[in-house]
Amino acid sequence: MCEKKLNMPVITIDTDGMELYDVGEEKAWLELFRTFAGKGMIDKASERAKPNLDIEKKQGKIGVLGLTPQDISDLQAPKKIREYYQEKEGKEAICYCMGENVCRSTDGLDNHRKAGEVEKNIVVSPAALAAAKYLEKTFGTPYEVTYPIVEELVPDMDYRRKKILIVHQQVIGNAMRAEIRRRCQKVNGDPSVDNNAVITVASWFMMKQELSEEGDISLREEDDYMELIKKEDYDIVFADPMMKRMTEDAYKMAGTGCVADAHETERKRIFIDATHFAVSGKLREEMKKREA
């Protein structure tokens, strides 16, 4: 009825207003591909989907799942990701649901209909993991969970042997952790010395068990966060700028002093902005303008 009245495709998902935004996102991502992507084949004996071998893979095309302003907090991210894969791998990145390739299309669902053609999917938020698994099951498309342009989120400083907390959506948090570890390993020195930082990833939102490391934390209340800061006394905290005052208050309550900004490296405890739109309603572009 709605499709006829609006003259456009309509999908429905069950939401009750009692969950966080990423639960609805997860359902929406999955339903978009279930509805509009070319179908796989069903093995009648097992009644399970098997890869549709009739869909021809187009080498040089990569799908990017999970790009939304709420998760990425950067409206320029699709452009940066497309440039990254073009320059690094000579491949075309298809950024579903966000970016110029969506807005300029005569039909924003064209890329979804051709989703089975990409050679690989990149998952940049936990809410898109279920959709990636569906596409793997339906078309045999492998996926990788990462944030390809993570280097710009991690300032150039000494992270060796530091105790670090990263608060963001899980995939970006994990990518930042991996990038910090990579930088620690690159530092010249005695190979027998462990230069690695101790890094915990936490989030106010979806935390997939399969993407978690031991000690990662799902935050529920502000008190949970403040108790964590007081107890663990982190050297460096990456979090949305809205959380900076809360972080300072927690350190004061613990009697360990205030935190400094990233450029004030002589101070022990450092707070580094890791803007997350779902936390503050602010984009990275807005925060940069305020700092300028």
What is each PLM-predicted segment?
Residues M1-A292:
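An N-terminal assembly and electron-transfer interface module characteristic of large anaerobic redox
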